[in-house]
Amino acid sequence: MPEENIRRKRRLSSFQIIILGFAGVILLGALLLMLPISTTAGGVTPFNETLFTATSAVCVTGLVVQDTGSYWSAFGQAVILTLIQIGGLGVVTVAASFALLSGRKISLMQRSTMKDAISAPKVGGIVRLTRFILRGTFLIELLGALAMLPAFCRDYGWRGVWMAVFHSISAFCNAGFDILGTENNLYPSLTGYAGSPGINITIMLLIVIGGIGFLTWDDVCENKWRFHRYRMQSKVILVTTFALIVLPALLFFFLDFDALPLGERIQAALFQSITPRTAGFNTVTLSAMSGASQGVMILLMLIGGSPGSTAGGMKTTTLAVLVANAAATFRRRESAQFFGRRVDCGAVKTAATILMMYLALFFGGAAFISVYENLPLSACLYETASAVGTVGLTLGITPQLRIPSQMVLITLMYLGRVGGLTLIYAALSGKKATGAKLPQEQITIG
């Protein structure tokens, strides 16, 4: 076999680079967290716990087996925050940023990998878009930290500076990690700031901006408020995001938070409608919410954010395409439509495939944990939705799980972040699709 063909066969596809890149960063993070300097007690943390924490950070989830604020030292927290930033931006984007800073030329293969990593439509302009992402990310995170600085410095003194920076990056990257400590062995998250408009509004804005996707930012910045000039995908993302914030917020407002004053009740309803779509912060006790509200939160966790964003989940566009396809079927139209444009049939197939994959992971993981740990299925469904949607919300069972159940959640977080289709494309890289067509036959549906 010629040497050139051997090199071509050995070359990794962009999808393989993405999944291996995430795995490599997770492993490195887990090893760093095992160092005695990473903990406040100065001991060595078991590998399964550091692997869980590193996976949760890189996959911007927020589920933890040890409290981030009290268990990990300043060094350990810095490692976790670095992993969150890398996971939020994407391993490939971070690697490309170092290449840009060093002045090296970006090859066509690297540009193609960057395109796949941020779900860009084409290779052209990808370097400009990467620069835009990096500048926008650090500017927004800086503004978020400055907005929260007064509240945290008031409560924590100079340590409030680190608190503001940590929570700004964690919120923008939709990670949900906090360093506010524990109360009665529970993780209160931001419940201590439920009445603080400054903290609530800042965190909500960071979550939404981080979750709508880098391409949508670019579209909005280029076309300003001229909605009619946005790409169809940007329009779909913005409208779907708005609906997924307002409708659940109305439901939560009427079902929960009766004891709160009107202003705090509205604030709590809005926050709890935004955070399940992959952020992981909470300003109320989640276990005290009604069963209906918890069910809605599970759906929101599975849906997640938008393509090419810091968020995970099935993505808002997947939901929108499935709903539009159902509407087209009811109206006897041949294809789904958005804003006067048809949706490609391949997109509908992809959306259906993603839905089936997430449901299989969601129910399969919950069933295993429920049987193995002898826990109620409802609590396990909440936890697995949080893991596969890379959310980080919990009803409190994650720290109690044994190693096999932790491995299940680690797998779900990883698959939820890199994306099931990325793994499929990586496995099928280099394989040619067959051109043969089998005879067609009708099958009755419904």
Name each region found by the language model.
Residues 1-446:
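Membrane-proximal intracellular helices of multi-pass ion channels
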